[in-house]
């Protein structure tokens, strides 16, 4: 069973994933040939977001916003603060004010902010904002006190170890003063806490990870060797749970409190979550918000992808992506379009309780009559970037 963002980013994401895992378990399709494979991170490298979290004192760690949401914050998977809690702290100043925001390669008012007007109002309150990006985006223009140009992949010596394989990226060019975000983090770290950033450059940092923070099976420990090999796969094995390869103590079993596959999730129970898969109605659905549904009688989805773009990237004029897909599109079924007197290609306003945007209609016969499917991530670099236009993002 494969799943993607349709499962990952919904109200019921965790519970749905739990249900799918249960199906794997009761049918015996776990880490076996033809079944669902349990993938380990390449050569034992740490996959958690936020490198260096262990260097913070317990007092500083306790101040992380969103600790009351333990699934990510206490599971060791992410050291990041809870995004909604950060937004609330900016708005209210509680439990403490957020005075500075640093954003790297993100364009939230065009893309990841589900409530862009709210996010716009909040980020305007922050004392100092740094944006590190490839392009001057609506987010950079709207909020940044300082814009730092980011290096593209061909301008970076780096590695990628998100699961497998381990991949080496080799720098082949340099444009002006652009640097990679890892090098930028090292530069800032050396000024703030040099004792925690002893490496002389980004390559030295990577080599230190290979030497000191892997399981000892990685086939290289210096960058020159890695450049020649380009990528490296760790040895692959089925039935890792039977060989002690899933638990930090090296014992057979799964990385759960009981060591078994748990249909009744004991860790969820400990954290105060329902230990069994369950359904929760979305907060703005026709069932949970009937009065809102009377005003806005279509269910709007915004997660659909277009093959030409990745989130808010590649919108520049002259780019082949914009030539193939020049305008933002939304979809209705033939019946829903006819009911509203709309035809293919019409420009329409799409509105809900959070705001509105304008996109062109594409009629999709496969779509449910109760649903409108809109694209996300749109902005128009060819338009004026200054306030209030902000490249047409609003």
Located regions from the model:
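Active-site rim elements
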Residues: 7-10, 171-178
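Long, contiguous, secondary-structure-rich segments that constitute the structural scaffold
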Residues: 182-229, 316-331, 335-394
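Extended redox/cofactor-interaction regions of prokaryotic respiratory oxidoreductases
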Residues: 22-142, 151-158, 170, 234-340
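Short, well-ordered loop/turn and helix-capping segments at boundaries between secondary-structure elements
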Residues: 25-32, 125-128, 146-153, 190-197, ...
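Stable alpha-helical elements in mature extracytoplasmic
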Residues: 10, 19, 181-184
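Aromatic-residue-lined binding/catalytic grooves and analogous aromatic/hydrophobic interfacial grooves
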Residues: 2
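Short glycine/threonine-rich loop-to-helix capping motif typified by GTGT followed
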Residues: 11-18, 47-54, 114-115, 214-216, ...
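Glycine/threonine-rich phosphate-binding loop and adjacent beta-strand/alpha-helix elements that clamp
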Residues: 154-174, 189
């Amino acid at each position: 069973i494969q799943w993607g963002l349709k499962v990952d980013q919904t109200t019921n994401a965790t519970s749905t994933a739990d249900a799918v895992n249960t199906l794997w378990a009761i049918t015996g399709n776990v880490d076996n040939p033809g079944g669902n494979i349990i993938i380990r991170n390449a050569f034992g490298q740490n996959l958690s977001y936020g490198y260096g979290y262990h260097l913070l004192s317990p007092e500083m760690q306790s101040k992380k916003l969103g600790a009351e949401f333990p699934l990510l914050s206490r599971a060791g998977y992410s050291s990041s603060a809870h995004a909604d809690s950060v937004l609330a702290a900016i708005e209210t100043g509680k439990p403490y004010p957020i005075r500075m925001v640093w954003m790297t390669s993100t364009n939230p008012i065009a893309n990841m902010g589900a409530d862009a007007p709210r996010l716009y109002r909040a980020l305007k309150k922050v004392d100092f904002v740094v944006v590190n990006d490839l392009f001057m985006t609506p987010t950079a223009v709207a909020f940044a006190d300082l814009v730092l140009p980011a290096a593209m992949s061909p301008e970076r010596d780096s590695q990628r170890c998100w699961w497998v394989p381990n991949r080496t990226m080799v720098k082949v060019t340099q444009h002006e003063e652009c640097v990679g975000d890892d090098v930028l983090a090292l530069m800032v770290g050396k000024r703030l806490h040099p004792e925690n950033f002893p490496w002389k450059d980004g390559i030295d940092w990577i080599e230190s990870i290979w030497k000191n923070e892997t399981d000892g099976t990685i086939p290289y420990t210096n960058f020159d060797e890695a450049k020649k090999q380009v990528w490296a796969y760790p040895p692959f094995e089925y039935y890792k749970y039977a060989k002690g390869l899933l638990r930090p103590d090296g014992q057979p079993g799964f990385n759960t409190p009981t060591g078994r596959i748990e249909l009744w999730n004991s860790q969820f129970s400990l954290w105060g979550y329902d230990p069994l898969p369950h359904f929760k109605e979305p907060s703005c659905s026709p069932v949970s918000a009937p009065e809102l549904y009377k005003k806005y009688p279509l269910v709007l989805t915004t997660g659909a992808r277009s093959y030409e773009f990745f989130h808010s990237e590649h919108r520049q004029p002259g780019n082949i992506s914009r030539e193939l897909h020049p305008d933002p599109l939304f979809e209705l079924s033939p019946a829903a379009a006819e009911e509203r007197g709309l035809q293919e290609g019409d420009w329409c306003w799409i509105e809900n309780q959070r705001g509105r945007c304008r996109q062109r209609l594409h009629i999709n016969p496969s779509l449910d009559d109760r649903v409108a499917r809109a694209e996300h991530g749109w902005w128009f670099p060819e338009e004026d970037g200054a306030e209030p236009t902000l490249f047409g993002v609003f």
